[in-house]
Amino acid sequence: MPQGKPNILVIMSDDIGIWNISAYHRGIMGGQTPNIDLIASGGALFTDSYAQQSCTAGRAAFITGQHPFRVGLLKVGMPGAKQGLQDKDPTIAELLKPHGYATA
């Protein structure tokens, strides 16, 4: 990666709440997330969060930067369904790769 480019770390999870992250619950709940806590201690804790109505819609919105309605992914899709990302829909990975980022 070229010098001067910021690191981008995405942590995406499914079906958790703020109290599942120990940096937020500060020992009140049972689960521990030491690696996320380490990141939080050197940065910032967010107080607001937003989500789509389903995990599929949330992933589609993040991957494409578009409202899930535009790409037809409002709820969990089924194998063989017509809805889904099309070749014309660029993804965040496709847009970052030409700028020197390693993407998966």
Task: Outline where the language-model segments fall.
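Formylglycine-dependent sulfatase
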Residues: 1-104
